[in-house]
UniProtKB/Swiss-Prot annotation:
Keywords: Isomerase. This is Aspartate racemase. Optimum pH is 8. It comes from Enterococcus faecium (Streptococcus faecium). Substrate binds at residues 48-50, 85-87, 167. The keyword Nucleus does not apply. It catalyses: L-aspartate = D-aspartate. Signal peptide: none annotated. Belongs to the aspartate/glutamate racemases family. GO terms for molecular function: aspartate racemase activity. Optimum temperature is 37 degrees Celsius. Homodimer.
Length: 243
């Protein structure tokens, strides 16, 4: 297979399924051959990223992720998509282990703030691990935006939605989701809310009548993935036609 990309997912699996669904549905295709070529690594047994970030005595996910990168080096995709926000804590080490470009989901989400001409405060929602590591805060602040991190009470609600409702119970609790967004916009006085966890993106995919100003990181990554894959496919076709 030529002109393909690789998806490094499984963290978690339902969120990865959501990402794959997005790229398939958003790719404009009228026949099988017009869809995108990709390989999916659904590495569900990667140890919990947040658990390790919060407590270094927990099992380190890095060796598992590096093993995945070594396999990518053998396959030689055009680029790699990492569909776990918290795993971007290891991004620099992962990118250093390969010459294949890895798309940076938090950076793409931060760039979307610029595209949408954001001027106000930006709330960042995600796992405790990504909050502690500053994965999104760093990218957003680098572009000059004021960031707001959830306080303990709000973070507990986010944790409950991500881990208990979605990961453990496979339940998309729309009422709790909207309660969290309302707090971020109204109580924290934020113009935009970044969904910096793929479980939150999964929640957003199926939320009805969502009028909150969210920046859905996974949705944006899906769009950038499609754009890049199509551009590289077209470039390859142009090269062939010139010969």
């Amino acid at each position: 297979m030529e002109n393909f990309f690789s998806i490094l997912g499984g963290m978690g699996t339902m969120a990865t399924e959501s990402f794959v669904r997005l790229i398939n549905h958003r790719t404009k295709a009228t026949k099988d051959q017009e869809y995108l070529n990709y390989v999916l690594f659904n590495h569900a047994t990667v140890p919990d990223r947040t658990a390790y970030i919060l407590d270094r005595s927990e099992e380190n996910p890095m060796p598992f992720l590096l093993d995945d990168i070594e396999k990518q080096n053998l396959l030689r995709p055009n680029f790699i998509v990492l569909t776990c926000n918290t795993a971007h804590y290891f991004f620099e080490e992962l990118q250093a282990a390969t010459d294949i470009p890895i798309l940076h989901m938090p950076r793409e989400a931060a760039n979307e703030l610029v595209r949408q001409h954001t001027t106000g405060r930006v709330a960042i929602l995600g796992t405790e691990g990504s909050m502690k590591a500053g994965i999104y805060e760093r990218e957003v602040k680098n572009l000059g935006f004021e960031t707001v991190i959830p306080d303990t009470a709000l973070q507990e609600k986010i944790n409950y939605l991500i881990y208990h409702e979605i990961k453990e119970s496979d339940h998309l609790n729309q009422e709790l989701y909207y309660e969290i967004l309302e707090e971020a916009v109204e109580r924290l006085n934020c113009e935009k809310v970044i969904l910096g966890c793929t479980e939150l993106s999964l929640m957003n995919e199926f939320a009805e009548d969502n009028h909150y100003p969210v920046i859905d990181a996974q949705s944006i990554l899906a769009d950038r993935t499609i754009e890049r894959a199509l551009a590289e496919r077209n470039e390859a076709l142009d090269t062939v036609s010139e010969k």
